[in-house]
């Protein structure tokens, strides 16, 4: 039994924040699943870097270029294709876990972050296009996003609610989820599977924001502990919300709790152990998310121990000290959400620009081949006899 399998024995699911076409086609995904990975989340930054530096998507981009597809639509088509392939591969896990794991999660265009109506419409559209049961669409936990969570849960859609940096925001999301789940069970449960959703709580970003404030106040002994304390407090809040008569009625009808999903678990501070957040947040009924590097580190030298019973007291003690220092964690959480939402929007724009540049590179290669008869990428050669790109 390896370390991921030990986490499974303790009731924690293990997902990977990585996806690119060669990863899906080469057998690397198969190897990670064999190690114990149970879900995937697409990473926009990695997607852009792959398009820029690798040939994974050249053939697919060229096919879209020759069809006259604009760059934003090319992005969408590439992601949908990857998600479909990954979801098909992960479907066995989805079935064996009875819909708890085996999901592939993809980002929603951040331009919709403050628009509940169009968020709902776009998620429904994506779900229909992808047409896979084990797909989660990521909805940011803005006020509009939380409103959309209620509507989409009512419709039976599984979601990954993102950009959560505080326990209070998790609680608001959880209440919307329960409200939607109750309606779903009253109206749709006879013909649709009950949705399974998670909330991505960003870990390392919190310490990155709080640690400099602690250092300024001479409280270095508190550094690197705030994110873990908040995550542990969130687990306690989750246990409280998903208990009692109201929830028990929902659970008896097949409702599942809104599991916390630990994201950004790679420490930003090199002084912290590379497996620090993974090891300190081992808990049943949660999902922990690995980067490739953190996964390799944890499989090599990670510790698997869980002391959940001590978490409430430890978390309360630390957070009380932080509050006494005048550090406003709610304000920091709000700022982090806004910063990361802006970063997500910029990342999507960067992908569109990157695809446009790649399109130009492929068109120039086509033109050079036509003039000089030089060798070009095989993806282009397959199209040369019959097609010419539509220039936009």
Predicted regions and their residues:
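Active-site-adjacent beta->alpha loops and helix N-cap segments on the catalytic face
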Residues: 23, 115-120, 139-153, 166-178
